[in-house]
Swiss-Prot record:
A Gene Ontology biological process term: alanine biosynthetic process
Subunit structure and binding partners: Heterooctamer of four alpha and four beta subunits.
PTM: Is synthesized initially as an inactive proenzyme, which is activated by self-cleavage at a specific serine bond to produce a beta-subunit with a hydroxyl group at its C-terminus and an alpha-subunit with a pyruvoyl group at its N-terminus.
Organism lineage: Bacteria, Bacillati, Bacillota, Clostridia, Eubacteriales
Name of the protein: Aspartate 1-decarboxylase
Source organism of the structure: Pelotomaculum thermopropionicum (strain DSM 13744 / JCM 10971 / SI)
Length: 132
């Protein structure tokens, strides 16, 4: 049996741009992509912490170190610059690998600079805005 599991996520990134007239996708700073092991053209799920919207799109590599998080095309209607989003990637694994795999959790600051990369995730205390 194969399971779809969390591979990685970029946690609470700040949307820097939205471009309705572009063909689609999310542009992500190359440095963030590497830290989260996300490839160009990979499908990701985006969760908007400000309005609850959840949607899927694919990734375009943005300039390294720029902090860019830009939603393009129709997805631009679901975010505003300044919104906080979680960008999630998944992987299909067999049950054995799924039991031991530890996803990368990329924590960023308000300018989308990497603060910490964690391996795995745990439930945080009520009211916490980051995971322990």
């Amino acid at each position: 049996m194969f399971l779809t599991m969390l591979k990685s996520k970029i946690h609470r990134a700040t949307v820097t741009e939205s471009n309705l007239n572009y063909m689609g996708s999310i542009t992500i700073d190359e440095e963030l992509m590497e830290a989260a092991d996300i490839l160009p053209n990979e499908k990701v799920q985006v969760v908007n912490n400000n309005n609850g919207a959840r949607f899927e799109t694919y990734v375009i590599k943005g300039p390294r170190g720029s902090g860019v998080i830009c939603l393009n095309g129709a997805a631009a209607r679901l975010v505003q610059p300044g919104d906080l989003v979680i960008i999630i990637s998944y992987a299909i694994m067999d049950a054995g690998e799924a039991r031991t795999y530890r996803p990368a959790v990329v924590m960023v600051d308000g300018r989308n600079k990497i603060v910490e990369v964690r391996q795995g995730e745990a439930h945080g205390p009520a009211g916490a805005d980051t995971c322990p």
